[in-house]
Curated annotation (Swiss-Prot):
Residues 416-428 have a biased composition (Basic and acidic residues). Glycans are attached at N48, N59, N101. SMART domains: RING. One of its GO terms (molecular function) is transferase activity. Keywords: Cytoplasm, Cytoskeleton, Glycoprotein, Membrane, Metal-binding, Signal, Transferase, Transmembrane, Transmembrane helix, Ubl conjugation, Ubl conjugation pathway, Zinc, Zinc-finger. GO terms for biological process: protein ubiquitination. This is E3 ubiquitin-protein ligase RNF128. Disulfide bonds: none annotated. Pathway: Protein modification; protein ubiquitination. It is a single-pass membrane protein. Residues 75-183 form the PA domain. It is found in: Cytoplasm; Endomembrane system; Cytoplasm, Cytoskeleton; Cytoplasm, Perinuclear region. E3 ubiquitin-protein ligase that catalyzes 'Lys-27', 'Lys-48'- or 'Lys-63'-linked polyubiquitin chains formation and plays a role in different biological processes such as modulation of immune response, cytoskeletal dynamics or protein homeostasis. Inhibits IL2 and IL4 transcription, thereby playing an important role in the induction of the anergic phenotype, a long-term stable state of T-lymphocyte unresponsiveness to antigenic stimulation associated with the blockade of interleukin production.
Length: 428
């Protein structure tokens, strides 16, 4: 009948700290007894276990020192030592029966009982306080309670209110079962319990699970919202960039279709009553290259072109050059559709002559900047009719209204009815 030497040899040295860390983790994950105070700090217990092994008539002591126990929450924090004694009878290991007895060894040669510790198994339908109180009534100096079968070396901080008269600790099931089997083989096992280290506060596995799930949900929601927000901003930025590029490209095309004019000596814009460029606030000079917008306002080419690229509107009247030239931009997807009337050439021809006509009465800011030579109105009507005949040959039925562009409604009153040319339906 040999002693359980394997455990004693393997636990010597520095294995106690690593086991303690593992037990601390298991303690946090293990369920607590009803009424336990999981938020309180927990004290571990150093255990010095020794076996008196009879061998060929000679007693030999084998010991092991480890930090494998946990003090109960209502237990006195003090050291205690004694011989481990289980309850009598194989079915009484839980010590839930109030008539449970313990067979305590006596000092050799006398009837005086030695100092002893009750070795009790957890469970059986009674509380920790019932087990510890029974051990105290039977004269034990302390109670060592080992965990359920199947829990290996997991331990929990016991709560046993009303049973704080003696030291009470809990050890793992594997540890307690090994000691119990040694006692049942007739080996006397002695345990010295010393106060270990303070750990805490402790939480049970339900708290850890709740905190973990909550943290995961919050983190996932935060990351998901950040990804969604970033993707949305990136998509909007790309769409805006595409739109701006498209608008700039259309603005370049529109600027290329606007008329340019080089001012000469004798032009109204250079005379004593001449106006200045609204962008750079400088007077016009001979040989200045000016841009004529669709609203008949003129500006220096170098001044107004950068403005038109960014804003696409007249700096003075906010007239949109894209719309004035028949370019419509779809704001939703940035697509651009060109809508040029059939009578575009006719309208341009008519409007150019009418702008020359209005330049006599309008101010330099709102006046036309066409050349001084104006063809008679009869020639304008004749050329218009020729263009309409050309359109009539290319289409069976075309209805075109040629309406001159008016930059300001106040000038419309000065126009005579015969300056509008309306072409009705022509059938071949």
């Amino acid at each position: 009948m040999g002693p359980p030497l394997g455990a004693g040899v393997s636990c010597r040295g520095g294995c106690g700290s690593s086991r303690l860390l593992a037990w601390c983790f298991l303690l946090a994950l293990s369920p607590q007894a009803p009424g336990s105070r999981g938020a309180e700090a927990v004290w571990t217990a150093y255990l010095n276990v020794s076996w008196r092994v009879p061998h060929t008539g000679v007693n030999r002591t084998v010991w092991e020192l480890s930090e494998e126990g946990v003090y109960g929450q209502d237990s006195p924090l003090e050291p205690v030592a004694g011989v481990l004694v289980p309850p009598d009878g194989p079915g009484a290991l839980n010590a839930c029966n109030p008539h449970t007895n313990f067979t305590v060894p006596t000092v050799w040669g006398s009837t005086v009982q030695v100092s002893w510790l009750a070795l009790i198994q957890r469970g059986g339908g009674c509380t920790f306080a019932d087990k510890i109180h029974l051990a105290y009534e039977r004269g034990a100096s302390g109670a060592v309670i080992f965990n359920f079968p199947g829990t290996r070396n997991e331990v929990i901080p016991m709560s046993h209110p009303g049973a704080g008269d003696i030291v009470a600790i809990m050890i793992g099931n594997l540890k307690g079962t090994k000691i119990l089997q040694s006692i049942q083989r007739g080996i006397q096992v002695t345990m010295v319990i010393e106060v270990g280290k303070k750990h805490g506060p402790w939480v049970n596995h339900y708290s850890i699970f709740f905190v973990s799930v909550s943290f995961f949900i919050i983190t996932a929601a935060t990351v998901g919202y950040f990804i969604f927000y970033s993707a949305r901003r990136l998509r909007n930025a790309r769409a805006q960039s595409r739109k701006q590029r498209q608008l700039k490209a259309d603005a370049k095309k529109a600027i290329g279709r606007l008329q340019l004019r080089t001012l000469k000596q004798g032009d109204r814009e250079i005379g004593p009553d001449g106006d200045s460029c609204a962008v750079c606030i400088e007077l016009y000079k001979p040989n200045d290259l000016v841009r004529i917008l669709t609203c008949n306002h003129i500006f220096h080419k170098t001044c107004v072109d950068p403005w038109l690229l960014e804003h696409r509107t007249c700096p003075m009247c906010k007239c949109d050059i894209l719309k004035a030239l028949g370019i419509e931009v779809d704001v939703e997807d940035g697509s651009v559709s060109l809508q040029v009337p059939v009578s575009n050439e006719i309208s341009n021809s008519a409007s150019s002559h009418e702008e020359d006509n209005r330049s006599e009465t309008a101010s330099s800011g709102y006046a036309s900047v066409q050349g001084a030579d104006e063809p008679p109105l009869e020639e304008h009507v004749q050329s218009t009719n020729e263009n309409l005949q050309l359109v009539n040959h290319e289409a069976n039925s075309v209805a075109v209204d040629v309406i001159p562009h008016v930059d300001n409604p106040t000038f419309e009153e000065d126009e005579t009815p015969h300056q509008e040319t309306a072409v009705r339906e022509i059938k071949s």
